[in-house]
């Protein structure tokens, strides 16, 4: 890119900020590198505090332990949920996505870049593991355990499950405070099957005020039942990285008005991050705002399809997209970008991605696109209230 375009690009990215602070000056990829070095310097003290908790020197989940862990993680993540533990051999840092697949992507990136010096003493885990013993929650003077919950499963064609759950101890909560009852059950489900399987395979669940007809099973046996039905071993069930490479196809009704706006012409697409696409379509920005705080952005490269006129036009358009993805990935590197799918529209084709180093990715893409035989190409983030920038 020319010097003036570099300035224009940086000014464009600065305009994303609503607080006056440009988070992209310190991109996520750099935060991760520096963050792991900070973790290395402080991890011995964190291990000591975990051991103190195990030995009863400090209370379970004490403010002291939480503060020590946040001090090591906040240089990377402004908002992070985690658990710590010890499995008899190594200390464990468990990073949780709070039921949101979009949050898995930066957590997996962080996990993959853990230095070997950290991994000698720590297991860095993304997503809560199943609690195979009879986990229980004590609320309002009574214990509610997985053994108290019965479940009926209805499997769908896409290998996701709809659950119907009955717990006698929760019936009164269900009548008095339904949201609270569902919150408790979310916790129990995560402990029963693990966070990744819960996000990936449980489409929805319903709490019942009385048992359902037919044979049910205790919640303690749900994980094994899901494994058997899906034909997966434990590691496959809990593999968050593999889940982030799983794609979902979707169809939309396109707007034929060429002036309707970015992405309004899309009629079909595929994505590995459904929540991101859904939020954009619903004019929401929670995920994008959260990404921005950590020096991440997500968006699309779009290019005009008017120049593709051969008989195999559709294949040409998609082949061009695949080639563009490969060239950008080779030039920018996996450290800078993760591609998450794409979409086809009446007037444009779209290549979707998450950028861990946004400025580098856009500069690389502009350099590659300038030599392509297409009439128009631009970048647009998955914010409805932000403009795109022309790259060709």
Predicted regions, residues:
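Charge-rich, low-complexity segments
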Residues: 1-92, 98-102, 113-346, 356-366, ...
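"Short basic amphipathic alpha-helical interaction patches in structured regions
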Residues: 107-112
